[in-house]
Amino acid sequence: MTTTEIRLDENVQAFVVAATRDAEKAFRVLRETGTVTGNGTINFVERVPGTEIAVALNEPGPWADDRTVVPVVAGFNGDVLSGAGSAGFVTGYAKVFRAHPEITSVVHVHSPWLGGWAQTHRVFPIRYAAVQRLTLSRRIPPHIDRSVGAGDFILDQLTRDPDLIAIFEANGGANVIGRAGLLELAKLVVLLEEGAQYQAIAETLGGSVDFDKSNLAVQWGRTGLADEARRRGLI
């Protein structure tokens, strides 16, 4: 990785300003809703459309005297173009961005209930209606073998599940995938954390139960996914 302070073109600069503003809002909401607590690890990476550049936006954390969000702009090759910090998360997801132009954003997040499920090394079935209606994906897999990078693991899982929305970082948190920008990704994280909590509570009551197909039809019908679900034989 090298650091090369250059003048970014106006479109990239404007994108970085907007992404930083969105990240500030997301960090505030994720804290206020209790989605993250304690150390509050949240690392967004937002690709700059039409380029091989991404913006890394990290929550400063509770110990920071200055809570200002400082973006790091880096190329997929690891060169830092603007800001002080590592391009690690950018390079970690670069293969994913290159192979899947529909993916706009990835966030690495530690939250209590998603983190709890990450401790189990179990595949997490999506059984919360507010999450399921947003995706045709039905599960969140655990990334256990850390000799394989997160980006490579995500790529492999996308070949099995093209609608994948997240993976668990075994014994850590989750990497959540966005296809509609940073704020929509942050909203998904809030819902995933809610669902993880509800399903954990259900574990104490005998376990959560999968959707009836009629319920899946209702949920996907609300978000325009029902026709594709029928084409795939999911309902």
Please report, for each region that a protein language model flagged, where it lies by residue.
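Glycine-rich flexible loops
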Residues: 1-235
